[in-house]
Amino acid sequence: MRRAPDRGLALNFGQDLSPDLQSLVFATQGATHSEVLGTPIKAAAWHTKPSWFVIAANDRMISPDQERDTAKRMGAKTLTLPTSHLPMLSQPAKVADFVIEAAASFAANAAAPGGMLKTAVA
């Protein structure tokens, strides 16, 4: 039996998902552990590593303007999609292509003379 999605999820978290996918998210999305929000970060990787950021233009959980500002501060390569908070579910192919682009960029950098791969092997 399909469980109806939570109204808040349907309207504000995954508003661009099908009702079946909303139901799946509702059934499987766990609560955020408080330690995640309260644990200080000692070193943010984006200070020293290339970053990629998917901006969800129709996100109702995190302001898209805040997402853009964060990506800019990180110096991240961005992909803006007209999606809810869950672009990986509503537009998985576009998100996957972006992840593949990021991985290919890292691999190319690592293999270049003086790149990360040479440094790690040396």
Regions of interest found by a model, annotated:
Residues 1-43:
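Helix-rich cap/lid subdomain of alpha/beta-hydrolase
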Residues 30, 48-49, 74-77:
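Short glycine/proline-enriched coil/turn segments at helix->beta-strand junctions
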Residues 47, 52-55:
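Short beta-strand/loop motif that positions the catalytic acidic residue
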Residues 57-82, 101-102:
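Conserved loop-alpha-helix segment in the C-terminal half of the alpha/beta-hydrolase fold
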